[in-house]
């Protein structure tokens, strides 16, 4: 049976897991690490770098290194003002108002989906090697508070990476699956998920294999990146006070500050004070400047106090929506690396009057849960029923620019709802359906998921035509909308792919490009390996010549020496076919030498005197 992997596509790091022998297991990447940085870069020669190797070169290549891309996926340019200012690469707006990421070395704009697909591709290629079979099917997680277009965009990223994405599952729900797989007693759990770029709170009731989401709340503009940014801003201010130089204008310095801030934040989870040392951070006419600064936990908590306070609101909202008191919560599960921050753990404890459960790995639990969901879909795991909800209300714009809700937030999915609407003016022959997502009263204040037209309505006084609008949400939380005029039966339907996601043609084009690039990358890797083999053969052949110089025929010696010289020349000029031919020729010649030497040794052994020995028993 084909394996279905679970992928946690994170803002900072990503993880892939699979069900093996009835137990979920995290799959290490090709470098042997269990988490992979969600970082993609292009080198000056056009080579694609993904993961740890991309992260390591970010300081010297800030404009071509793309990180925290999850904060842009499925969003319009106008929605990312704050996030745009936090990255060192260029984020552009296309004619449709969508987000594009510019790569100077390639002189090309990429969509966030394309960049995310490279991370997914790295994970699945590593998993394919690890499992010994090609991975084509996956369950991918998203923050519970992701809207429809962000979910669709994540699914598109999976498609571009060559995957059949069987299910999009909410991260806190996945975490609850991992936590509650073997739980038999009924429990109400609160999943507090603070990742690199998003924050979710989900309350579930679990027991006897049923995982029912009672409510979800969150903030898709809050995560570990924001905590790093507070430290970076403080360092920039401190440096400006000391040297009157604004480091925020220097991309390379800003990248170094960001890395140092992340490192300091992580260290302050286990120590009370850390040192930030940045030699040669910049230079003046008087010479280079080194930056050294101490940061203690108290100062860090002061810097991020506003962010910590923001974490309380979704907790309160989730309890209110689930109609529960904090005393009703049996367990608190912490998810995401940012939950290691002591101030966050204290906030959770104070807000819910309970110590959080520390038995799950916050970095891996989401991918593990996604792998369990994959096993459920594959039929490997039975007796598990997952009842998730839509995180935000869905509706249409009606007369006066009002949002009329059709499916309230926290409705269990999949679900379907139909309402009858009519025309606003006499003899109206078409209607435009404007689909919205959000909790505000006015249409303009909510997220627009798209519009479509229903034509062919028979002319009639306003209010007479009956237009049946049906909202259908699937198990992925992705919406389809149908509008039908009841008299004529005229119908128009659309899967809301979100105004900022890609259409089918674009996806197919990007998939083809990704496949071509993947083939080119494989070819580059094969060529590098071929050159490495050739270097080894040159070294070994030369060693053999030096070692047996006196025993080798002079003509043969000269022939091999010439072949080695030609092979070295072919390596330096990248003549790959010639490299293969010369490698073969050298191997053939050195084998002949080996045979001749062995033959001579055998003759010498036969002709040598044989010494008889007498043995006596002792």
Curated annotation (Swiss-Prot):
Pfam families assigned to the protein according to its UniProt record, in alphabetical order: HSP70
PROSITE patterns registered for this protein in UniProt: HSP70_1 (PS00297), HSP70_2 (PS00329)
Alphabetical UniProt keywords: ATP-binding, Chaperone, Chloroplast, Nucleotide-binding, Plastid, Stress response
Location of the protein in the cell: Plastid, Chloroplast
Homology family: Belongs to the heat shock protein 70 family.
GO MF term (any one): ATP binding
InterPro entries: ATPase_NBD (IPR043129), Chaperone_DnaK (IPR012725), Heat_shock_70_CS (IPR018181), HSP70_C_sf (IPR029048), HSP70_peptide-bd_sf (IPR029047), Hsp_70_fam (IPR013126)
Transmembrane intervals: none
Domain of life: Eukaryota
Native organism taxonomy: Eukaryota, Rhodophyta, Bangiophyceae, Cyanidiales, Cyanidiaceae
Organism: Cyanidium caldarium (Red alga)
Cellular component GO terms, alphabetical: chloroplast
PANTHER family associated with the record: HEAT SHOCK PROTEIN 70KDA (PTHR19375)
Role noted for this protein: Acts as a chaperone.
Protein's recorded name: Chaperone protein dnaK
């Amino acid at each position: 049976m084909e394996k279905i992997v679970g992928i946690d596509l994170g803002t900072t790091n990503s993880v892939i897991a699979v069900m093996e022998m009835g137990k979920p297991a995290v799959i290490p990447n090709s470098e042997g690490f269990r988490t992979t940085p969600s970082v993609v870069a292009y080198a000056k020669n056009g080579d694609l770098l993904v993961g740890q190797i991309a992260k390591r070169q970010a300081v010297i290549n800030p404009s071509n290194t793309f990180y925290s891309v999850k904060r842009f996926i499925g969003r319009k340019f106008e929605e990312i003002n704050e996030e745009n200012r936090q990255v060192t690469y260029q984020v552009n707006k296309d004619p449709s108002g969508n987000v594009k990421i510019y790569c100077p070395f390639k002189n090309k704009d990429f969509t966030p989906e394309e960049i995310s697909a490279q991370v997914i591709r790295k994970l699945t290629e590593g998993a394919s090697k690890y499992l010994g079979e090609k991975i084509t099917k996956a369950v991918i997680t998203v923050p519970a508070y992701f809207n429809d277009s962000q979910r669709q965009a994540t699914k598109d990223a999976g498609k571009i990476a060559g995957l059949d994405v069987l299910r999009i599952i909410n991260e806190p729900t996945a975490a609850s699956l991992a936590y509650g797989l073997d739980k038999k007693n009924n429990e109400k759990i609160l999943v507090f998920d603070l990742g690199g770029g998003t924050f979710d709170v989900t309350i579930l009731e679990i027991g006897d294999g049923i995982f029912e989401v009672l409510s979800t709340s969150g903030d898709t503009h809050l995560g570990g990146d924001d905590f790093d940014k507070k430290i970076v801003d403080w360092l920039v201010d401190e440096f400006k006070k000391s040297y009157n130089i604004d480091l925020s204008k220097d991309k390379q310095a800003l990248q170094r500050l960001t890395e140092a801030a992340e490192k300091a934040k992580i260290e302050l989870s286990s120590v009370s004070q850390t040192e930030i040392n940045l030699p040669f951070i910049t230079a003046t006419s008087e010479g280079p400047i080194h930056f050294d600064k101490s940061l203690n936990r108290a100062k860090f908590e002061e810097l991020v106090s506003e962010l910590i306070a923001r974490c309380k609101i979704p907790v309160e909202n989730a309890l209110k929506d689930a109609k529960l008191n904090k005393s009703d919560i049996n367990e608190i599960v912490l998810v995401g690396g940012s939950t290691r921050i002591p101030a966050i753990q204290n906030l959770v404890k104070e807000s819910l009057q309970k110590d959080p459960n520390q038995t799950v790995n916050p970095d891996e639990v989401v991918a593990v849960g996604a792998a369990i969901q994959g096993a459920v879909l594959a039929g490997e795991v039975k007796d598990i029923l997952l009842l998730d909800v839509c995180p935000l209300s869905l509706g249409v714009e009606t007369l006066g620019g009002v949002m009329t809700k059709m499916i309230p937030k926290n409705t269990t999915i999949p679900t379907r709802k139909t309402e009858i609407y009519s025309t606003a003016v006499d003899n109206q022959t078409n209607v435009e359906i404007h689909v919205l997502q959000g909790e505000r009263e006015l249409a303009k204040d909510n997220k627009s998921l798209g519009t479509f037209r229903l034509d062919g309505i028979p002319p009639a006084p306003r209010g007479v035509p009956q237009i049946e609008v049906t909202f259908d949400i699937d198990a992925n939380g992705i919406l389809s909308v149908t509008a039908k005029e009841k008299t004529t039966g005229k119908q128009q339907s659309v899967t809301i792919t979100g105004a900022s996601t890609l259409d089918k043609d674009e996806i197919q084009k990007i998939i083809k490009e990704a496949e071509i690039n993947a083939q080119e990358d494989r070819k580059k890797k094969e060529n590098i390996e071929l050159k490495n083999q050739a270097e080894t053969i040159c070294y070994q052949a030369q060693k053999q010549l030096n070692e047996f110089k006196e025993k080798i025929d002079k003509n043969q010696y000269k022939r091999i020496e010439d072949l080695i010289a030609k092979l070295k020349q072919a390596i330096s000029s990248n003549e790959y076919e010639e490299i293969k031919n010369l490698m073969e020729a050298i191997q053939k010649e050195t084998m002949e030498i080996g045979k001749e030497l062995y033959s001579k040794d055998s003759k010498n052994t036969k002709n040598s005197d044989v010494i008889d020995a007498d043995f006596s028993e002792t």
